[in-house]
Regions:
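Conserved nucleotide-cofactor-binding alpha/beta core module
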Residues: 1-2
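PAPS-dependent sulfotransferase catalytic domain
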Residues: 5, 10-114
Length: 115
């Protein structure tokens, strides 16, 4: 865990002890994050599948995100993401907080207090 925190320091613009790592494929690493950073807050920011896929399609990512340039691949990837998150909820109950984008933008006060 310490090595991850140290190595990601170069990508952060602040020295605060927390940050958000929001790459699209982080969901596959929930178990590892829980093991190496047991106090980490794991937030699953969800959005309507269409909006999520379209947002990924329009974003120019760095290496490793080639699936975002094809809508059919995005649809398959989204389904895999959804199934993987169901798995994490089963094996790590209460460790992942689902935050729904649509609810957050309509009621930020309530949603911001959930965590």
């Amino acid at each position: 865990g310490r090595q991850y925190i140290d190595e990601t320091r170069a990508f952060r613009s602040t020295n605060k002890p927390f940050f958000t790592d929001k790459l699209p494929n982080n969901f596959s690493h929930v178990g590892l994050v829980h093991l190496i950073l047991p106090n980490a807050k794991i937030i699953n920011a969800r959005r309507h599948p269409f909006d999520s896929c379209l947002g990924g399609y329009k974003q120019l990512f760095g290496k490793g995100q080639d699936f975002t340039y094809d809508m059919m691949e995005l649809a398959v990837y989204y389904r895999q993401y959804h199934e993987t998150m169901r798995h994490w909820h089963r094996v790590l109950p209460g460790k992942v907080l689902d935050v729904h984008y649509e609810e957050t933008v309509t009621d930020l006060q309530t949603q911001g207090r959930i965590t």
